[in-house]
Design a protein with these regions (language model features):
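Catalytic core of pol beta-like nucleotidyltransferases
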Residues: 1-24, 32-38, 49-129
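Conserved binding/catalytic microenvironments
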Residues: 41
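Helix-adjacent hinge/juxtasegments
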Residues: 44-48
């Protein structure tokens, strides 16, 4: 399946996740950056405050074997996502600088972007897709 078809299916997946309580679904990794290959999976950050404490249960709640690519979800609460932004964690930096909001509330990403700066001290605000 071509990139546009995969992206459409991922947006549908994200819409279903938001309908089930997720606040935002963000595509990160090679599919978001555009340097994907035929073997790339879909790295997804799902922000939801309605998730189990157990990380494995969180992931299994958002698996979908019907998608044309393997999905690697990272499921975080809003508090966890913002804490990771404050810590400058790579995955959150990637979400802010290269990520594609598939569906959900862009304000969460904007809030996290306030904590991040480039090495030269300047900051970049996420403007959305």
């Amino acid at each position: 399946m071509e990139y546009e078809g995969v992206l459409k299916r991922l947006v549908d997946y994200a819409e279903r996740a938001v309908a089930r309580g997720a606040k935002a679904v963000i595509l990160v990794g090679s599919l978001a950056r555009g340097d994907y290959t035929a073997f790339s999976d879909a790295d997804i950050i799902i922000i939801s405050d309605e998730v189990p404490e157990n990380p494995i249960r969180r992931i299994s709640d958002f698996m979908d074997p019907s998608l044309p690519v393997d999905v690697e979800p990272l499921v975080l609460t809003t508090e966890e996502f913002l804490k990771m932004a404050k810590e400058g964690r790579r995955i959150v930096r990637e979400a802010i600088f290269y990520g594609k909001l598939l569906f959900g509330d862009p304000e969460i990403i904007k809030a996290a972007s306030r904590y991040l700066e480039f090495e030269d001290g300047s900051s970049e605000r996420w403007e959305g897709e």
